[in-house]
Design a protein with these regions (language model features):
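Short hydrophobic alpha-helical segments enriched in small aliphatic residues
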Residues: 12-15
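Active-site-adjacent structural elements in enzyme catalytic cores
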Residues: 20-206
Length: 206
């Protein structure tokens, strides 16, 4: 690589980092079992307009964006510094929300759904056309989870959207189990952090 190309690449990276870190991140504390409806509604509105909200799940904190909005999903990759070919997981808040985002639910998958959802189990399905390629990393399949955490379920339900959400940390860093961990990596890069205390499991879903 020539010096000119190297300098241009470095400048592009710096501009991307600066562009990603220009907002004030809102921090809201929520009761992990009975989250305040007004705070949840605030987070849901951010998601609807294409913003990013970090929220607790039973496993780790997730970084959520509108899973049907390609630009919002690209924002997740940018905030985390995550390779765009590394697929995201779509989160739903009830079983009926699965059918619109997948082409089919095999009988074997339905048995697992009946046994383990809601909970820390991520499943892979053939994706429906409505799911953007930015979610799946260009694959024909999509990962879906139905979390059991009250804050996560309330946020998804209030937004009326499948929420694309990897762990809410900088790529390559440990997965966050507290809001303070999220803030350390992503403060200024995302719109909101919902602080629901420590994640129960502390490990990402299967």
């Amino acid at each position: 690589m020539t010096l000119a190309l190297a300098a241009a690449a470095k400048n592009t990276k710096n501009v991307a980092e600066q562009t990603c870190k220009i907002m004030k991140t809102i921090l809201r504390k929520v009761d992990p079992q009975q989250p305040d409806a007004a705070i949840i509604a605030e987070g849901a509105e951010i998601l609807k307009r294409g913003g990013l909200v970090a929220f607790p799940t039973e496993t780790v904190y997730g970084l959520g964006g509108n899973g049907l909005d390609s630009e919002a999903c690209k924002g997740i990759y940018l905030a985390k510094g995550r390779p765009s070919d590394n697929p995201l997981i779509l989160h739903i808040s009830q079983i009926s929300e699965l059918r619109p985002i997948v082409r089919e639910v095999p009988a074997a998958a339905q048995k697992l759904i009946d046994a383990f959802w809601p909970g820390p189990l991520t499943m892979i399905f053939p994706k429906a056309d409505i799911v953007p390629d930015s979610v799946t990393g260009g694959l024909d399949t999509v990962a879906v989870r139905f979390p059991s955490h009250p804050v996560a379920m309330a946020l998804i339900r209030a937004s009326g959207l499948p929420i694309a959400a990897p762990s809410a940390n900088a790529s390559g860093k440990p997965s966050p189990t507290r809001a303070s961990h999220v803030a350390f990596d992503l403060d200024g890069k995302i719109d909101m952090i919902l602080d629901g205390g420590a994640a129960e499991w502390g490990l990402e879903s299967t």
